[in-house]
């Protein structure tokens, strides 16, 4: 059983993550029968690391803790732990994270800045492995226009308007309230804001859009795996939106597929962060704007819409660095080390 709160709060989120750790513990222990060589734990959620370490001890396996998000840093950066870093919840969370990071054989993560953060948290540099999010590049190479048109018709999106697409989790760390504000400012232009996905913040955003009478904003459920290439190719501008303070703790996995399809993305990130540096190092790969600024977001959308719809800089970067087979081959070599 898994506890999924209808209206998330800090306590309810902790209960949600804890219930997942408890419910997965017994199936995890059953795996000791075949004595794995490596056990990989994925964060979120840190709550599962004690079970992973126990299984490793029972089976003699080596452990890898893979960090997708620094969930403690994200919690503190977004003010979800009460009194900030000095609060009791924050202190307990930080201690729990430290224990998890320091008691595994390797720590892997998805960006260079997140690798540096692991080292700052006391992990030995030789134990830290680069394991970026990948993309199945071939899936996004030849997306048929007919598939895009069919999906567009299925979703009821008009042909005469450009699509501003957000596809992914709809939670607190994204700061999607600014997308509502941007849609309101652009309501008289031939644009549709398509918000695709699920999450604890979706109902609130739908209510905000309804209260403001935003006919240029539509919400859709998460689309199927098979529909993803057509969905991403459909977008004239992709939104990769996060609040200030989250850009190095959380590197959006959605960006890899946007780059693979050659999409034009507007990324909210400070210049010094991993995402900000990506945009500076590879000019034209995306439009980087200040987080939590409606004015910057609107300007970024306008800029992205002036670009050719197929972004060759993004596409070529994805082919060089994000191909699934290459990423997995390197990771396997690293953990065999």
What are these regions (language model features)?
Residues 5-12, 34, 59-94, 138:
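Acceptor-binding helix/loop patch of EC 2.4 sugar-transfer enzymes
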Residues 29, 35, 47-50, 54-59, ...:
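Membrane-proximal helix-turn-helix segments that form the acceptor-binding/catalytic region
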Residues 113, 134:
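Carbohydrate-associated surface elements
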Residues 141-157, 312:
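A short helix/loop element that forms part of the nucleotide-sugar donor recognition site in Leloir-type
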Residues 158-174, 180-183:
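Conserved donor-binding/catalytic core segment of Leloir-type glycosyltransferases
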Residues 174, 221-259, 265-280:
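Nucleotide-sugar-dependent
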Residues 190-197, 202-229:
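Nucleotide-activated donor-binding/catalytic signature segment of Leloir-type glycosyltransferases, i.e.
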Residues 291-292, 296, 305-335:
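A charged, aromatic-enriched C-terminal amphipathic alpha-helix characteristic of glycosyltransferases
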């Amino acid at each position: 059983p898994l506890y999924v709160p209808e209206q998330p709060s800090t306590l309810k989120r902790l209960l949600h993550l804890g219930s997942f750790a408890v419910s997965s513990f017994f199936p995890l222990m059953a795996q000791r029968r075949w004595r794995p060589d490596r056990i990989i734990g994925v964060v979120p959620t840190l709550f599962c690391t004690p079970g992973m370490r126990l299984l490793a001890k029972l089976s003699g396996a080596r452990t890898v803790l893979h960090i997708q998000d620094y969930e403690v840093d994200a919690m503190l950066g977004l003010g979800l732990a009460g009194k900030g870093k000095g609060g009791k919840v924050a202190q307990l969370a930080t201690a729990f994270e430290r224990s998890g990071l320091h008691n595994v054989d390797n720590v892997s993560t998805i960006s260079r800045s997140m690798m540096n953060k692991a080292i700052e948290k006391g992990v030995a540099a030789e134990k830290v492995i680069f394991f970026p999010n990948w993309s199945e590049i071939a899936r996004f190479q030849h997306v048929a226009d007919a598939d895009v048109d069919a999906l567009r018709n299925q979703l009821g999106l008009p042909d005469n308007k450009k699509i501003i697409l957000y596809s992914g989790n709809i939670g607190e760390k994204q700061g999607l309230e600014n997308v509502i504000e941007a849609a309101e400012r652009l309501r008289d232009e031939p644009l549709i804001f398509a918000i695709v996905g699920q999450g604890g913040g979706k109902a609130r955003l739908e209510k905000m859009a309804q209260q403001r009478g935003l006919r240029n904003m539509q919400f859709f459920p998460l689309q199927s795996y098979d529909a993803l290439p057509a969905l991403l190719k459909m977008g004239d501008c992709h939104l990769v939106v996060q609040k200030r303070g989250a850009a190095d703790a959380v590197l959006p996995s959605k960006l890899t597929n946007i780059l693979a399809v050659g999409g034009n993305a507007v990324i909210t990130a400070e210049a010094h962060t991993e995402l900000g540096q990506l945009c500076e190092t590879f000019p034209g790969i995306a439009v980087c704007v200040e987080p939590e600024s409606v004015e910057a977001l609107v300007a970024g959308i306008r800029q992205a819409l002036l670009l050719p719809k197929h972004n060759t800089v993004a596409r070529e970067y994805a082919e060089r660095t994000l191909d699934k087979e290459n990423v997995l081959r390197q990771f396997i070599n690293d953990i065999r080390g």
